[in-house]
Amino acid sequence: PRVLLIGDSISMGYTLDVREMLKGKANVHRIPTNGGPTTNGLKNIKAWLGDSKWDVIHFNWGLHDLKYIAEDPSKRADPKAPGSHLQVPLADYEKNLAELVKLMQATGAKLIWCNTTPVPAGSDGRVEGDEKKYNEAAARVMTAAGIPTDDLCTHANAKLKDVQLPANVHYSPSGYHYLAEKVASVIAENLSKK
């Protein structure tokens, strides 16, 4: 079965481990770049899906949507600085996700939503805990569409001090391996349901 991973740098961090863990069970692919915010997803989703047939698509957007930016969208801004704003406000995020889900559902693949991992205190350009609001918005979209959730946020929170880098949304190599165990297990469960 062919599996496509869509996500940001967090998914980049766990891809190789997931591929190794599913060796002999699935052919694991990943989009060729950082998925960025949902606005980037909408621009690129058709190219990422291509003409290939996908059995499972495991996808996430969030950490870039809830990032604060100023004039230059490629640079993070202090959330308290004048002129800084969310890259994708919550209502737009929810609307964009619903649109992305429709486009992915059209492929006939089994979809698995992966919720957004924790934003710790001191994380540059982000506000601690903002992932909760974005995950709630995403949950409304996924519930309406009947899409299961890989709750990577709760999984990461269980060992956050051991697996996440200090004041950073990223993870240590062993932290990415820990995330990969959950991702691979959820994908494996859904392969048999296809």
Model-predicted regions and their roles:
Residues 1-16, 37, 64-66:
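Catalytic nucleophile-elbow at a beta strand-turn-alpha helix junction centered on a G-D-S/GDSL motif
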Residues 20-27, 39-193:
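Alpha-helical cap/lid subdomain in secreted, periplasmic
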Residues 30-37:
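Short beta->alpha junction loops
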